[in-house]
Amino acid sequence: MNMGRTSNLNVKNRDLKRNFFSNLSLNVRVLLLVFLITLIVFYIFFFKPLNYSILYNNLSNDDEKSIVSRLISLKIPFKFNQNHSELLIPSNALKKVYLDLAEQGLPKEKKVGFELLDTEKFGLSQFNEEVNYERALEGELARSIQKLENIKTARVHIVLSKSSVFIREKKIPSASVILEIKPGRYLNYNQINSILHIVAQGVSNLQIENITIVDQFGNLLSSMNDLYNDSYSNNQLKYSNEIETGYKNKIESVLVPLVGVNNIHAQVTAQISFDKQENSEERFTPNYSNEKQSVRSVQNKKNIEFSEKYSDNSFSSNQGVLSNKKLNDLSNSSLLFNHNNIPNFSEQVSSTKNSKRNLSDESVIPQSSTNQNYIVNYELDHVISHNKFNVGNVKRLSVAVVINYVKDKHGKFVSLSTDKLNSIKKLVCESVGFSRKRGDSVSVVNFKFSTPEVYFQSPPSNYNKYISFNNLFEFFLICLGVIILCLLIIKLNFLKILFKNKKRIDISNNYAVKDNLTSQNKGVEDDKELKKKLSSVLESDPKEIAMVIRKWISG
């Protein structure tokens, strides 16, 4: 009886363990659900990752040590980025930390800008004012340069020109920039050129040629010739690639509708001239014909001279020249006109007339001289031409086109006919602007393409991503704590249920024991009554009892 009861108890315990959640009451289930939701909300609001913001970047070693020790004393969490260049703290504590560090005077190596001029004292000398202005200007330029990518720190030194009435030759301003580049980074031409222009535009009368840029290793970065050559070569390569890609796209856009998308491959090589050419030409064309002649100016000059010599025979003492008279008539005219009958040379006409006459009372010898110059100036056929050729002209093109076989009616791949290849070649020539003068070459061939093998690549797994060990350990501890709490709650409820069941079992066992006891008591009472009856029978009829005992013995 006892063995059967213990086996029944074990079966009941197993059923209780298996059907624990089903045996739970509705109130207990609701309480468990509310508890789990509370844990999730608690984790989201109290254990979520903090939003970090940049406190300072590119700190020196001394400032970094001082600031970190101060954050530790304030019990504010902090961390650095992967490059160890930015100090990060929670965003909600940013203002508090700024104020506290400002009270401590941190960081000490902070760049000073134009705010230095706000604290000038009264009675400051001119020299101190100039020095403060230079310091403020250097600090502002250094701040601007440090905003650029790949630059960790920057220092700027400026020598300004001093104007004075006693100095005739004005000093040219100059500047030097020292850059500390981030590890593993470099500056390209555009970034260096931008730094040069920032400094040049920030200082009055400063030329780019007077700016020197040096990195932390002592390398000179401001060599304009090298910068220009590097940039020019990069731009040339980029321009050539764009030209070749444009021609390639033109070829594919023409041939793809004919042969299909994946049935054509084109390659274009362009030789481009980047030489700068300027041509000046001056030509003189002779204009012998009268129709092409154009008169620029005409000069007509006429000079007439008169002289008379009188001689009287009655006056012997007054022989000789009695009178001498000259008349000069100068006529100059400059005319601008076109005339077909005017010769193309200078004409000079000279005429001299002499006349003599004899008088009775005197001897008169009149003389006249005429000098005439006629000059015509013609315009020359003069042509001056200035030709400037564009940079980036295509000198020669080489085009190669490969076309795949096409399918026939039976689905087999066959080559294209010669006529089709020739027509395709003509289309290619027209699309790229083929020119024999340049020596362009176009080649179109027909081959069967090989079918590429398809490799299925699995999508990238998230397990390959970088996971911080600290975050993983914290998450593991949180999950472990939640699991332990859930197990404790489940165990407590299970123990409560078991305790109730044990009470029920004990009560039932007690009732069974009582039943057994009552049955045993009833059996004892029955034995007593039998004994009484036997004793009464023995007394009344001993012979019958002897007969019964003999039968029991005989069997």
UniProtKB/Swiss-Prot annotation:
The chain crosses the membrane at residues 30-50, 472-492. Keywords: Bacterial flagellum, Cell membrane, Membrane, Transmembrane, Transmembrane helix. InterPro entries: AMP-bd_C_sf, Flag_M-ring_C, FlgMring_FliF, FliF_N_dom, YscJ/FliF. It comes from the Bacteria. It is a multi-pass membrane protein. Disulfide bonds: none annotated. It holds the Pfam family YscJ_FliF. Belongs to the FliF family. PANTHER family: FLAGELLAR M-RING PROTEIN. The M ring may be actively involved in energy transduction. The basal body constitutes a major portion of the flagellar organelle and consists of four rings (L,P,S, and M) mounted on a central rod. The M ring is integral to the inner membrane of the cell and may be connected to the flagellar rod via the S ring. The S (supramembrane ring) lies just distal to the M ring. The L and P rings lie in the outer membrane and the periplasmic space, respectively. This is Flagellar M-ring protein. The gene is fliF.
